[in-house]
Amino acid sequence: MDKKNMQSIIWKKNLKTGEAENYLKRSWSAPLVRRGHPHRDTIKIHPNSTLLMIGDSITDCGRISPAVEIVRDSLGYGYVKLIHNQIRATCPKKHIRMINRGIAGNTIRHLAMRWQSDVLDLKPDWLSILIGINDVWPKFDVCQPDEWFVSIDEYASTLEHLIRTTRSQVKGMVLMTPYCIESNRDDPMRAMMDRYGDVVRQLAGQYQTILVDTQAAFDFVLTEVRPTALSLDRVHLKPAGHMILAQAFLKAVEYDS
């Protein structure tokens, strides 16, 4: 039996036994293990750098306030923590420090309001931004007021302003596209999210930042798995979804260990 058919059978079995997330974790972790290759210990982020990751609930993931981070983990339980663990375990000599400044419910408007205190005042060497999901979601969630919706023009102009304000003060910047865990590209929410993602792609090219195309990463997996294996509401991620985000980020910053 060839490898592809074997994986298909394993996937179907995992769906029945509720182990889809474990399967995805194993399959997406595998590329980081290069048996027989020398340990190269490389990553685009410079040694002794501070990497700040800012965004909404996808970044937040239960992080606690800086006031008590000395006694408890302040990176949350999502993709930020996974990235931290991978770098710490395999590139310890790099001494890369990570800061999580995600806040659940945030839009680009909220980021702009707290940019000085949560980004500029902290003087990070590297900055990663994942924002846009909550800007779109109010259009499709009856529980959210219409005024929470952020138009694509406001989203684009505000994000560009933040990039222009910050790029000269950091060594590197990473832009992550918003996403929708939906394989049907004609779905209204997916289609709108793609347009906001296009804004991020355009700005990443214009300002020569690193781009993490999260939607492309999810789309690759969605050819083999159901959306519910990654998220129940097409936004908030199960552990396997966070693993995909972490892998996409590490690939974009040329992580190799």
Place the predicted regions along the sequence by residue.
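Short glycine-rich His-centered loop
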Residues: 35-73
